[in-house]
């Protein structure tokens, strides 16, 4: 796939990854591409549909023949699961014209539970204990809310005193191709991968940003040896999904100045491409995340923060958000702060 859509140094123009992918696939002879996904989940940020899962869009834009299949056997939950029945309920509501605010059916449910505020802290303490922490997640509607939850969990439940410590779980929030060798099992550090901080060695401020040298392990690749990387601290509590375009441009230009003694422009760019500060890993804490960030992952215990429901009916985007959040769970769903009119009992 061309670097325009994948590499961090392309900060001055926007490119369409799907366009680049289709160009790459069909530049070969007799090539095919398979897109797999759930059309009821949240579409990419800033869009109302998932283009790669929309046959009409693909035919119109790329003039290709499309074959569609639908998988209907659930593998993540048992057929008797309340998580499954509520996910199915919401999915059906997405296809209906009238969207009732009675989203959740709590009748005889033991795995989809309303949590009263008086019991929330005790429940979180139990769920974020050492032997359960990797199986718990709070799903919330904004990075600002996620930051608040992450701060409270680290301070009041995990008793973390410093900005980042050994034992912290973090999510990579932007693909990184620098720190892992290509022949490793993972291949690269992917947006959405969960890591554990094994050790923190050094903090520094340079290029107008703050960095730390840390040792990490990849939770999804237990055979991968711990890895020494440099992370950028500014993204951790930012209210944006990752380092913004302007900040990325600022970092690029600052790093570029370190190599201004090199006369050839292409050679200066090559130096930036392998610079550890420019390639610093972008991360956020992984105790609470936005719904978009949780897509593709699964946890035993999913706490769903209240998604503001103020009208008599829900719009489709809100239902997609709730459906995506519910389907992250393999065991239990806890509903935080939802008013009574959201439930069927």
Label every model-predicted segment.
Residues 2-14, 47, 77-78, 312:
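Flexible beta-alpha connector loops of hexameric P-loop NTPases
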Residues 1, 170, 302:
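Receiver (REC) domain switch-region micro-motif
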């Amino acid at each position: 796939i061309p670097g325009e859509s994948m590499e961090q140094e392309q900060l001055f123009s926007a490119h369409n990854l799907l366009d680049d992918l289709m160009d790459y696939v069909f530049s070969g002879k007799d090539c095919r591409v398979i897109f797999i996904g759930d059309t009821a989940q949240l579409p990419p940020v800033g869009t109302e549909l998932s283009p790669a899962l929309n046959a009409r869009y693909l035919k119109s834009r790329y003039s290709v023949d499309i074959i569609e299949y639908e998988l209907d056997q659930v593998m993540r939950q048992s057929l008797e699961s309340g998580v499954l029945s509520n996910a199915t309920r919401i999915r059906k509501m997405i296809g209906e014209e009238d969207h009732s605010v009675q989203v959740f059916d709590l009748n005889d449910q033991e795995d989809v539970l309303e949590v009263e505020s008086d019991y929330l802290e005790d429940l979180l303490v139990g769920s974020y204990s050492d032997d359960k922490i990797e199986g718990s997640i709070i799903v919330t509607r904004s990075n600002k809310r996620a930051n608040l939850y992450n701060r409270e969990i680290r301070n009041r439940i995990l008793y973390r005193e410093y900005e980042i410590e050994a034992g912290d779980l973090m999510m990579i929030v932007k693909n990184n191709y620098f720190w892992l060798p290509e022949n490793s099992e993972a291949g690269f550090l992917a947006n959405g991968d969960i890591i554990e901080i094994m050790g923190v060695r050094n903090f520094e401020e340079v290029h107008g940003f703050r960095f730390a040298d840390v040792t990490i392990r990849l939770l999804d690749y237990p055979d991968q040896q711990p890895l020494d990387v440099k992370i950028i601290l500014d993204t951790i509590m930012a209210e944006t999904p990752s380092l913004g375009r302007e900040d990325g441009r600022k970092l690029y230009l600052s790093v570029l100045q370190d190599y201004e003694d090199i006369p050839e422009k292409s050679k200066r760019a090559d130096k930036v491409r392998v610079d550890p500060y420019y390639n610093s890993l972008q991360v956020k804490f992984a105790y609470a995340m936005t719904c978009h960030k949780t897509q593709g992952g699964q946890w035993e215990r999913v706490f769903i923060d209240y998604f503001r429901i103020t009208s008599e009916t829900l719009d489709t985007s809100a239902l997609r958000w709730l459906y995506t959040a519910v389907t992250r769970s393999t065991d239990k769903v806890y509903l935080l702060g939802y008013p009574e009119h959201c439930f069927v009992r």
